Amino acid sequence: MSPIIHSLLDTDLYKFTMLQVVLHKFPQTHSVYHFRCRNLEDTVYPLVDILDDLNEQLDHLCNLKYKEDELQYLRKLRFIKSDFVDYLELFQLKRRFIHASIDEEGRLDIRIEGPMVQAMMFEIFVLAIVNELYFSRIKTDEVWAEGERRLQAKLELIQQYEKSQQPNDPPFLVSDFGTRRRYSFEWQKHVVAAFHNTVPNVFRGTSNVLLAKELNITPIGTMAHEFLQAFQALDVRLRDFQKAALETWVQEYRGDLGIALTDVVGMDAFLRDFDLYFAKLFDGLRHDSGDPYEWGDKAYAHYRKLKIDTKTKMLTFSDGLNLPKAWELHQYFKDRFQVSFGIGTNLTNDMGQTPLNIVLKLVECNGQSVAKISDSPGKTMTDNDTFLAYLRQVFQIEELDEAI
């Protein structure tokens, strides 16, 4: 079977930006990540059928190392430190830290346990492998043709949006955030190249570092939930974990990579911690769950209360978007904020087949549970309901959904 992952750059930029902070600030952290498929009822065949192929792909993944040209590319990114690239030169994923099996209920189970500087780098690779293995068994020429038809329709739609823009209108900016849910690497590259070549004034870049390198476009990304969640188990009061995470980020990047993620314990709790200091230091906020209009209006009110000009701040939306949703949000917020959009599944896996809704999330750090309390029912995730209840209590969050 041919390898699915050919390069350790075939992952999202924020894996590198988060790993650099972990390596510099808390390198001894131990972590556990757990796989979930949120729509098992929609699968054409049982996911467990890919288990043997998955294990073979993991064996290959753990043989990969960074090539010299890849390291040189990373060195050119101004926020990547030279000692971090030196670490990556020695880096290799260790097979003993990841286990794929069938759980007691007959579902595909993937568990990663080991040093966070190792464990956190598996996620995007594994999700991309699971997707490609699953869809390769139901691939037909008709599927690719339908994907191409939908891609061309998207490009035509963006060109219509461009024509409707007035000369002084703020730009409509879209990025590819679809590595983890892609149909295949080949398809993602095709989509990203098509957007880059056809609508270069709209297409801002891709989260995929390998594609950014190969196509000479901007790699996009800052932080994910796992970075903030880890601080729930580090040496700070639980009530202060968000402030500690944001402060650590600021100390590492000194003004670079300034988009903060708001929904680890919900937007309201985030804004209570996002004081004048952070509001001035960070360039903006990323939306990843809950009603995006309500969220953006809350951000607007918060910045206004702090007497900050919202036109100097960026709102990035990345939750289950397609182009019409993004365009409507752009119209709503464009006169108050700079706005950008990260589109994932709808760009890289819109083929007429039901995409897998799969995640591989941090559930434990240093022997202690961590959790995400999303602004969307169903996206909350933990392996420990007792800790989840305590976290809700500490941050005064009503129970709207159950952890999955």
UniProtKB/Swiss-Prot annotation:
GO terms for molecular function: nicotinate phosphoribosyltransferase activity. Catalyzes the synthesis of beta-nicotinate D-ribonucleotide from nicotinate and 5-phospho-D-ribose 1-phosphate at the expense of ATP. Transiently phosphorylated on a His residue during the reaction cycle. Phosphorylation strongly increases the affinity for substrates and increases the rate of nicotinate D-ribonucleotide production. Dephosphorylation regenerates the low-affinity form of the enzyme, leading to product release. GO terms for biological process: NAD biosynthetic process via the salvage pathway. Its EC number is 6.3.4.21. Pathway: Cofactor biosynthesis; NAD(+) biosynthesis; nicotinate D-ribonucleotide from nicotinate: step 1/1. It is an enzyme of class 6 (ligase). Belongs to the NAPRTase family. The keyword Ligase applies. The modification Phosphohistidine is found at residue 225. CDD domains: PncB_like. It catalyses: nicotinate + 5-phospho-alpha-D-ribose 1-diphosphate + ATP + H2O = nicotinate beta-D-ribonucleotide + ADP + phosphate + diphosphate. GO terms for cellular component: cytosol. NCBIfam families: NAPRTase, PRK05321.1. Keywords: Ligase, Phosphoprotein, Pyridine nucleotide biosynthesis. This is Nicotinate phosphoribosyltransferase.
